[in-house]
Structures are given as structure tokens and as C-alpha cells.
Amino acid sequence: MSRYTGPKWKLSRRLGISLSGTGKELARRPYAPGQHGNDRRGKISEYGMQLSEKQKLRLMYGLTERQFRNLFARAGKIREGKHGVNLMILLEQRLDNIVYRLGLASTRAQARQLVNHGHVTVDGKRVDIPSYEVKPGQEISIREKSKNLVIIKDAIEGTVGRPSFVEFDADNLKGSLVRLPERSELEPEIDEALIVEFYNR
């Protein structure tokens, strides 16, 4: 399955969650798209709830179904912790997500582009793989020739706070994942137990 490239705002409203992370999609119309969007939702089946939760998390991080399923399988092999929480932590460790969390991009999609186009380095070496798994302590920075990109400057200026599991040096446009996040620091709108149930049915 290919990555979803359709209208993100309508999809965000349908799923009831901001896929961009900005919250703008739901600010004016916090209901599903359509003439009577806020009156159309009937009772959702258990399977429907599980599927919806899986789609929310997958699309929030911009993964294809295959990528998401593979990551779910990896999370299941981690001996410590809960399966669903481990999945969310692995998603947070993706390089494109760390670039987003550091405030070097306004959205995860924009962060993925920065990585794809070779603007990001890990421990001084260019890495152009968005799914690269960042380990605590690794230094993430912007290449010297890319530091004047307008989209990066705009993203930094528009960033209001950063999660406590990352550190950022605004003067040198670099930062790091200082530790793995706790569940309480991750998306509160997601019920990861439903995702585990979806794949284990």
C-alpha cells in the first residue's frame, strides 16, 4: 500500500485527530467532512474502532501499511514494556519524527522531505532515510549549506516548546534524543491497545 497523499484536512476531520500536529484541521470544523458531518457518525463496531485507531497512528507518522505492520512486528519482539507502547516509542525514534520534535520542521511530512533531500546529519554523517532509528545520545543537525533554508527558519520561529525527551541547540541547529519517551509524553488521543487488538485478531 502506498503512502496516503490525499487531502489531509478532510482525513483529519474524518478520523477526529490532527494528522499534521498543528490542530488547525479541527479548529473550525471538529466533525467529519460532508454537509452534516457532525450528525453522520453512528455506532462504530469494535473492528471499526480498532481500524480507526490504527489508521490514526499510522497516518499521523506518515507510514505505509507495510511499514507500520513491520514496525508493529518489531515492537512485539521487545521483551520489556507493552507491545502498543513500544510501537509508539519506535515511531518516535524515527529520524523524520525527531527532526519534527526538535522544531526543525513544521510537520512530520516536511521533516520527511528534509531528510529525503539530504539536509539532515546524524553524528556528523548525512542520513537520507526517514525511518532511520535514532538512539538516545545521537546528535541530529542540519547540514551547513542547508542552515539558511527558509522552511527551517520558519519552523524554528513557529515552535512553541519541545518535549522533554529531546534537547535543542538553536544557535547551531542541532539537537538530540536524550532518552526514550514515556507513554505519558506521547499522543494522548491514541488508544494503542486497540491497535494491538486489531493486528492480533
From Swiss-Prot:
Family (UniProt):
Belongs to the universal ribosomal protein uS4 family.
InterPro entries on file: Ribosomal_uS4, Ribosomal_uS4_bac-type, Ribosomal_uS4_CS, Ribosomal_uS4_N, S4_RNA-bd, S4_RNA-bd_sf
Where does it sit, as one GO cellular component term?
Answer: small ribosomal subunit
| Domain named S4 RNA-binding: residues | 93-153
An example molecular function term from Gene Ontology annotations: structural constituent of ribosome
Which species expresses this protein natively? Latilactobacillus sakei subsp. sakei (strain 23K)
Q: Could you confirm whether the keyword Ion transport appears in this record?
A: no
Query: Which terms under GO biological process does the entry name?
Result: ribosomal small subunit biogenesis; translation
Keyword annotations for this protein, in alphabetical order, are: Ribonucleoprotein, Ribosomal protein, RNA-binding, rRNA-binding
| Annotated coiled-coil segments of the chain | none
Q: How does it assemble?
A: Part of the 30S ribosomal subunit. Contacts protein S5. The interaction surface between S4 and S5 is involved in control of translational fidelity.
Query: Briefly, what is this protein's role?
Result: One of the primary rRNA binding proteins, it binds directly to 16S rRNA where it nucleates assembly of the body of the 30S subunit.
Query: What's one Pfam family here?
Result: Ribosomal_S4
What protein name does the entry list?
Answer: Small ribosomal subunit protein uS4
